[in-house]
Amino acid sequence: MREIKTPKAPVPVGPYSQAVEVNGFLFISGQIGINPETGKLVEGFKEQVIQIFKNVDAILEEAGLKRENIVKVTIYITDIKKFKELNEIYEDYFKDVSVKPARVTVGVKELPLNAEVEIEIVAVK
């Protein structure tokens, strides 16, 4: 087992790793839309989702993986009415991936730092 961390993604907001690689799997901890340069949550739902995917890309790159390696996505969203907007951004992110990952989206009351969305990723080598 090895910890994956990069300065190109935000430091965790709690006592956990950005990601952990074990037995060919990469488990990326839930990401919220924090800009790693400022350490601040970006404003706006769309902007948060886009920032999350930038953070995911940075962690994947540090682990030597790409979007094509993502097999499972778990999304937590505080306003299920934004599901359609989420799907549009998500579809664009995975547009060049031939096999789309499995996914679940869960509506929740609130998230850390008042984020509107949090995304957790599982990838495989």
Curated annotation (Swiss-Prot):
Matching CDD domains: YjgF_YER057c_UK114_family
Coiled-coil regions listed: none
Entry GO MF terms: deaminase activity
Superkingdom, natural source: Bacteria
GO cellular component assignments: cytosol
A Pfam family assignment: Ribonuc_L-PSP
NCBIfam families according to UniProt: Rid family detoxifying hydrolase (TIGR00004)
Similarity field: Belongs to the RutC family.
Name this protein carries in UniProt: RutC family protein aq_364
Organism: Aquifex aeolicus (strain VF5)
